[in-house]
């Protein structure tokens, strides 16, 4: 099955950080961390799927598909990694160390108070938590990723220099050599 995903990446203190989400406890097929994506529906392109799934799986924290599309365009486009029929669309965003805290607290609050079947069926709580991972953390914690996704993690590790060059070139093109978080 052809699939598409988004993977936000930021630079903080000279290091790349990848934003991954962890499947909720009701996910039976493959537990663990991965990016934000899924299978193509109704003749969608992998990129259109990535935008839709990104909005759903991040519960709007980066906006809906149209907002994510604008964010990607504003930040220089995507670096694409293809693994079998799985299309990862990597893009730059500003590092926000609090994003996981706000996302995770919000989801924990709602998850504990709402009917789990309704939440699971809504597709709004596919990811129960998000975390920033450095490349070193990805190596150390690789077994915490979904089984199928561990091979994709290897591709990120193998292509780290190219990914970092892509992200840095997007910062230079935007004229923003330092993000707010990097100015500290």
Predicted segments with their positions:
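N-terminal strand-loop-strand
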Residues: 1-36
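Short beta-strand micro-motifs in enzyme catalytic cores
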Residues: 2, 17, 85-91, 129-131
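Short, well-ordered beta-strand micro-motif
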Residues: 8-10, 20, 90-94, 131-134
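Short, charged/polar surface micro-motifs in flexible loops or helix N-caps
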Residues: 13-15, 25-27, 41, 93-99
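Functional cleft and adjacent loop/helix regions within the main domain
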Residues: 28-36, 42, 79-81, 90, ...
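The catalytic Nudix box helix
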Residues: 35-75, 89
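Acidic, glycine-rich loop-and-strand cores that form catalytic or ligand-binding grooves
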Residues: 63, 67-110, 114-115
């Amino acid at each position: 099955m052809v699939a598409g995903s988004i993977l936000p990446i930021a630079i903080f203190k000279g290091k790349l950080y990848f934003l991954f989400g962890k499947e909720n406890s009701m996910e039976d097929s493959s537990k663990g961390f991965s990016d934000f994506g899924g299978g193509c529906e109704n003749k969608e392109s992998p990129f259109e799927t990535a935008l839709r799934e990104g909005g759903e799986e991040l519960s709007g924290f980066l906006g809906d598909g149209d907002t994510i599309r604008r964010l990607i365009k504003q930040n220089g486009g995507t670096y694409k990694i293809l693994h079998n029929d799985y299309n990862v669309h990597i893009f730059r965003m500003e590092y926000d160390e609090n994003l996981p805290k706000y996302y995770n607290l919000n989801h924990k609050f709602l998850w504990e108070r709402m009917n789990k079947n309704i939440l699971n069926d809504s597709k709004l709580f596919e990811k129960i938590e998000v975390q920033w991972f450095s490349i070193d953390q990805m190596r150390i914690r690789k077994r915490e990723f979904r089984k199928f996704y561990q091979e994709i993690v290897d591709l990120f590790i193998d292509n780290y220099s190219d990914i970092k060059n892509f992200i840095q070139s997007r910062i230079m093109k935007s004229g923003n050599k330092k993000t707010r978080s990097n100015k500290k």
